[in-house]
Swiss-Prot record:
GO-annotated molecular function: GMP reductase activity
Amino-acid positions noted as binding NADP(+) in the UniProt annotation, renumbered to this chain: 205-228
EC number(s) given by UniProt: 1.7.1.7
Cross-referenced Gene3D superfamilies: Aldolase class I
Function of the molecule: Catalyzes the irreversible NADPH-dependent deamination of GMP to IMP. It functions in the conversion of nucleobase, nucleoside and nucleotide derivatives of G to A nucleotides, and in maintaining the intracellular balance of A and G nucleotides.
Species of the source: Streptococcus pyogenes serotype M4 (strain MGAS10750)
EC class name: oxidoreductase
Reaction equation(s) it catalyzes: IMP + NH4(+) + NADP(+) = GMP + NADPH + 2 H(+)
HAMAP family assigned to the protein according to its UniProt record, in alphabetical order: GMP_reduct_type2
One GO location term (cellular component): cytosol
Keywords tagged on the record: NADP, Oxidoreductase
Sequence similarity: Belongs to the IMPDH/GMPR family. GuaC type 2 subfamily.
Entry's Gene Ontology BP terms: purine nucleotide metabolic process
Full protein name: GMP reductase
Length: 327
C-alpha cells in the first residue's frame, strides 16, 4: 500500500559520509553515460523557454553537457537539428503528442536527432505511449525520453512501450503550480517519488523538479536518478533567454513554467506561474560550481565516481535540514 512507504523530500534528507579515498576533489569523476554518449555532468537545464535557447544548447553541446531543446518554437526544430549536425554536435529536441507531431517525427528520417524527449505535464497517458511507439518505429536509433510521470506503474508502461528513459516529477518545480491547481503531483515528496519509481525502473530515470541546491543533485542520484533536470538554478543567468527587467535599479530575469499563461500566450489550462529572479553571472560559472560541489559530494561518499553516491546511508531529518534558515 502506498501509504506505507516513507514520504520525504530533499530538505528532509541528509546523506551520511564515508571515509574519503581521494586526495583532491578534482580526482572525482562526475561523468555520466546516457545512450551511446558520455556527458560531463548528470545535470540537464530544463527544456523551458526561459532556460534554454539554440545558442545555449549549442554552447552546452560543445562543452560536453547534455541538453534538451524546448518544443515551443516548432518550425525551428528541423533547422536546429541541421545546424547541430553540421557542427558535429548531438541534436536533442522535444515533441508533444498532437496529431501533427506524428508527421513531424516521420519527416526526421532524413536528418535524425540523437535524442527526442516527449514532453507533456501528465506523461502517463495513451497519447504518450502511442508517440513512443511511433518514434521507435520511424526512428529506431533515436534515444527516447518520455514524461513526466510520478508512479512506478507509469515508469513501467512507458519503458514497455519503448522509452529509453523516463522523466519523474509532477509539479514539484518552483514555477509549477500543478499541485495547487489540480491537487495532484509529487510536490513536497518528489525525492520519495523518485525512490519509489526508481525501484521499478529498468532504464535510466531523470529526476525533474524540486532541486533547490547543488546537494540535491547528489541526493537525487542516491535515490535512483541517472540524470537530474533543473530549472530555477539555471534561470536568471546573463545568457538566459528570459526577459531582463529592472526594478528599483536592480536587474532581474523572468522565469516561467512551461504550462503558464506567459508561455501559452493565452489564459487556458494554466499550471505554471511567472517569477522574477535576480540576475546572476554566467551559466558556465554555475556549471563549474555544480561540478565542484558534486565532486565534493563524491569525496564525502567515499568514492571516485557517481556510483559511490548510490550506496551511502542517509537519515530522514523531520525538522528539515534548514532548521528555520532559508536558502
Amino acid at each position: 500500500m502506498f501509504n506505507d512507504i516513507p514520504v520525504f523530500d530533499y530538505e528532509d534528507i541528509q546523506l551520511i559520509p564515508n571515509k574519503c579515498i581521494i586526495t583532491s576533489r578534482s580526482q572525482a569523476d562526475t561523468s555520466v553515460t546516457l545512450g551511446k554518449y558520455q556527458f560531463k555532468l548528470p545535470v540537464i537545464p530544463a527544456n523551458m523557454q526561459t532556460i534554454i535557447d539554440e545558442t545555449i544548447a549549442e554552447q552546452l553541446a560543445k562543452e560536453g553537457y547534455f541538453y534538451i531543446m524546448h518544443r515551443f518554437d516548432e518550425d525551428s526544430r528541423k533547422p536546429f537539428i541541421k545546424r547541430m549536425h553540421e557542427q558535429g554536435l548531438i541534436a536533442s529536441i522535444s515533441v508533444g503528442v498532437k496529431a501533427y507531431e506524428y508527421e513531424f517525427v516521420t519527416s526526421l528520417k532524413e536528418d535524425t536527432p540523437e535524442f527526442i524527449t516527449i514532453d507533456i505535464a501528465h506523461g502517463h497517458a495513451n497519447s504518450v505511449i502511442d508517440m513512443i511507439k511511433h518514434i521507435k518505429t520511424e526512428l529506431p536509433e533515436t534515444f527516447v525520453i518520455a514524461g513526466n510521470v510520478g508512479t512506478p506503474e507509469a515508469v513501467r508502461e512507458l519503458e514497455n512501450a519503448g522509452a529509453d528513459a523516463t522523466k519523474v516529477g509532477i509539479g514539484p518545480g518552483k514555477v509549477c503550480i500543478t499541485k495547487v491547481k489540480t491537487g495532484f503531483g509529487t510536490g513536497g515528496w518528489q525525492l520519495a517519488a523518485l525512490r519509489w519509481c526508481a525501484k521499478a525502473a529498468r532504464k535510466p530515470i531523470i529526476a525533474d523538479g524540486g532541486i533547490r541546491t547543488h546537494g540535491d543533485i547528489a541526493k537525487s542520484i542516491r535515490f535512483g536518478a541517472s540524470m537530474v533536470m533543473i530549472g530555477s538554478l539555471f534561470a536568471g543567468h546573463i545568457e538566459s533567454p528570459g526577459k531582463t527587467v529592472e526594478v528599483n535599479g536592480e536587474t532581474f530575469k523572468e522565469y516561467y513554467g512551461s504550462a503558464s499563461a506567459y508561455q501559452k500566450g493565452e489564459h487556458k489550462n494554466v499550471e505554471g506561474k511567472k517569477i522574477l529572479l535576480p540576475t546572476k553571472g554566467h551559466l558556465s560559472d554555475t556549471l563549474t560550481e555544480m561540478q565542484q560541489d558534486l565532486q565534493s559530494s563524491i569525496s564525502y561518499a567515499g568514492g571516485k565516481d557517481l556510483d559511490s553516491l548510490r550506496h551511502v546511508d542517509y537519515v530522514i531529518v523531520k525538522n528539515s535540514i534548514w532548521n528555520g534558515d532559508s536558502i
